Amino acid sequence: MENHVVELVQPRHTLIGENSILEIPQFLHRLEGTVTALVVTDQGLVKIGTVKKVTDVLDRAGIRYWTYDGVQPNPSVGVVNKAMEQYTRQGCNCIIAIGGGSPIDVAKAVSILAANGGRIEDYCGVRKSARPGVPIVAVNTTAGTGSEVTCAYVITDEVKNVKMVMMDPNCLAYLAINDPTLMVGMPPSLTAATGMDALTHAVEAYTCREATPYTDALAIEAIRLVGRALRRAGADGCDMQ
């Protein structure tokens, strides 16, 4: 009989709950040396004030940071390179991603490059990096991809016009945060789309060949919660229940 080994990889710390972003400084202060963070996000989240909610926390704690807000949906190699240039130029030693899958994916790419060097194209595939990436705080703002807790990221090679998929435990977040106060007020269409994305991921997890009793329990509960809450959340984006 073939031995079947299950490996579970997760962020070192995960916070879920209202105002959990207030805990970011205490986790950053646990890191070695003086923290200089690169905040990776997109201009839309800057304009609606979501990023300011997080950077206000950093300001009050006296944490030094720089912001890269050039992330676009389906982020490209060029975007990763620009973020990496700013990370290096400002002498950063950790990353705070604010957003959904795209900013978090860029943060993962920069994390791997900062620790391992080379080009992001070198890491396409499974477990291609030799060293753990620099610490990432992944602040999620949508309910869709789950990128804040996974070891996968996708970057578009705009030259070859292909999406590169990376699977690498070395890019896992140091701290993942799901703070619902950052998600209130989203347009109903975005709430619906990301909610259906979450439901799809849960169904996929339950029906895939690599499912385990552990993942089944999480998937079934996710399906139940989305089914109960999605219509309410779409009708009232400020409904915390």
Indicate where each model-derived feature is located.
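Carboxylate- and glycine-rich phosphate/diphosphate-binding segment that chelates Mg2+/Mn2+
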Residues: 152-241
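Hydrophobic/aromatic beta-strand patches that form the interior of the parallel beta-sheet core
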Residues: 66, 96, 135-139, 175-178, ...
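N-terminal amphipathic/basic leader segments beginning at the initiator methionine
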Residues: 1-31
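Short, acidic/small-residue loops that bind anionic groups at enzyme active sites
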Residues: 117-141, 170
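Solvent-exposed alpha-helices and their adjacent loops that cap or buttress functional pockets
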Residues: 6-8, 31-32, 88-90, 126-132, ...
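Glycine-rich phosphate/diphosphate-binding loops that line cofactor/substrate pockets in enzymes
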Residues: 22-38, 56-61, 89
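N-terminal small/polar loop signature for handling phosphorylated ligands or for N-terminal nucleophile
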Residues: 46-119, 232-240
